Amino acid sequence: MTLTQFNLWIAEIRNDRTRGASELARRSLELLAEAARSLPATDAVELRERLLALAVALSAARPSMTPIQNLLRRWRETLQSSAAPNLAGARCLAAEQAELLMAASWRAVAECAAHTAELLGPGRTVLTHSLSSTVVETCRLLKDAGLRMIITESRPLEEGRQLAERLSAWNVPATYITDAQIGLFVAQADAVLVGADSVLADGAVVNKAGTYPLALAARDQGVPFYVCCERFKWRALDDPPPELEEMAPAELDTPNWPGVTVRNVYFDRTPARLVSAWITETGVHWPDAGP
């Protein structure tokens, strides 16, 4: 693996606008497994140092996405605490640990979705925003149980289209709306269900911009607002709040207006007081019991 390839991998994670936090975390682990097998090194110590540097760079590429940081931190800790007898053993250990964490992430998504599907039950209309792997899996579990969906387009790149396409293939009735229409449609839903890119220790949720006003609309109209995500997305009490990433204004496809500043902040923060329940792989967590 060359320095050019290394930089291309970092750029891939940094510039990805279509995959969610968990998917990018698993992709980062996949890249680390590939690097473990192919990265030039003279001995196990050099390999470990080069892999650790790559993991740190991948973690820093998407500061709003906690699962990348948490899963890669766990991988780094395993690498630092394990002593491989030789270079071949070090390669095998690093790759296997990355693959084990990828599998753990997939299991957590499946378990989280199972708890969410049980909470929602059959015959429900659910409104969602952006694209979440746990929400997609929940929809798959409920697709033959009378599920109806309301999907926001999720500008600027409209990742809601991907969910709409899947629901259409599953023959799940769905309504596709602009983000600006959430206040009009939230009352038609039995529940709002979103994923998360990060959850703070107090239960506040960092997710695609538009989640906060959706939570406000849901609270105003008496519709429960559920957040389903794996525990890998939760930040420790002493972790600083994640950066709310801002992307290129060009994504909004606006003219060059003199004196006008175009902003494209991708994430917002929804206070814990607006969350009806958090659903993780360990079950449903209600506010009275703490997040």
Label each residue range with its predicted role:
Residues 8, 12, 27-34, 53, ...:
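Alpha-helical scaffold segments in soluble metabolic enzymes
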Residues 73-127, 135, 147-192:
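Ligand-binding beta-strand-loop-alpha-helix segment within the catalytic cores
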Residues 137, 146, 152-291:
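Conserved phosphate- and dinucleotide-binding cores of soluble alpha/beta proteins
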